[in-house]
Amino acid sequence: MASKDFAIGMILLSQIMVGFLGNFFLLYHYSFLCFTRGMLQSTDLILKHLTIANSLVILSKGIPQTMAAFGLKDSLSDIGCKFVFYVHRVGRAVCVGNACLLSVFQVITISPSEFRWAELKLHAHKYIRSFILVLCWILNTLVNITVLLHVTGKWNSINSTKTNDYGYCSGGSRSRIPHSLHIVLLSSLDVLCLGLMTLASGSMVFILHRHKQQVQHIHGTNLSARSSPESRVTQSILVLVSTLCYFTRSPPSLHMSLFPNPSWWLLNTSALITACFPMVSPFVLMSRHPRIPRLGSACCGRNPQFPKLVR
């Protein structure tokens, strides 16, 4: 085993452990809320599904890539390769969809009554579960089903000269036109979600900035320097959106989608980048989101008081 492969394997293993710990804590938190309250609030429900999707991405991409880095490149069968590739694609798409839904739902929730979309508050709370189920899970499971047609195990592609090597699995030969159409479809969904997230985040910054100015006008300019719940929510959403935009549309990820037979450097760089958002997002939420306790507070048995800004 080359030293560079061992180093990549250790980094991937560290990402899996850290990401799994953060997402497991959030899943435990939301499961506890579900059992104690009987039903999760809308924001909690979105974050729960985002956490589930994060876990799917970490496990389906991180574990096979780590095994390949440690020399176990032929460990997955044909069915195993199809399964992990399909789960990873669906999990990644659901991550983007839930993050988009979270941004849009948050800006609707905190919109003042004079905003036009404030009328959507009641409808958004009522149909949020349908949005998550249909737009995030069902749509993405259908769109990504073509993965099952071209991904195979490496042992099943040894005698084929028209395969794309992805480290632990292979992609069979495909017609360029259907493949290009599939890439355009997936990219269009990503661009739509990322555009909605950017618009919603910008609107939220504007709303919260105007709210801060109104508070300063009422109470004077001598406000506490401590970060307010409004600014913490704004920062957490902006960090999540910025992180997702960068790691989803990074140059290595785009290159992996457009060009076959990626190099060793591109293959492993893409794997490291792919795991960054699922690994970072739970800790961003725990550190700044007012409704989620910090990991240290939960471990020490503290019960922090949550602001009521986010519903």
Curated annotation (Swiss-Prot):
Functional description taken from the UniProt entry: Putative pheromone receptor.
Extracellular compartment residues: 1-5, 73-92, 152-187, 250-264
Compartmental location: Cell membrane
Ranges annotated as spanning the membrane: 6-26, 52-72, 93-113, 131-151, 188-208, 233-249, 265-285
Protein name as annotated: Vomeronasal type-1 receptor 3
Note: The gorilla and orangutan orthologous proteins do not exist, their genes are pseudogenes.
Glycosylation sites: N159
Cytoplasmic side: 27-51, 114-130, 209-232, 286-311
PROSITE patterns named among the record's database cross-references: G_PROTEIN_RECEP_F1_2 (PS50262)
Pfam families assigned to the protein according to its UniProt record, in alphabetical order: V1R (PF03402)
Family: Belongs to the G-protein coupled receptor 1 family.
Source organism of this protein record: Homo sapiens
Membrane topology listed for this record: Multi-pass membrane protein
InterPro entries (alphabetical): GPCR_Rhodpsn_7TM (IPR017452), Vmron_rcpt_1 (IPR004072)
Keywords: Cell membrane, G-protein coupled receptor, Glycoprotein, Membrane, Pheromone response, Receptor, Transducer, Transmembrane, Transmembrane helix
GO cellular component terms given for this protein: plasma membrane
Domain of life: Eukaryota
Example of a GO biological process term: sensory perception of chemical stimulus
GO MF term (any one): pheromone receptor activity
CDD domains assigned to the protein according to its UniProt record, in alphabetical order: 7tm_V1R_pheromone (cd13949)
Main subcellular location of this protein, as a coarse class: membrane
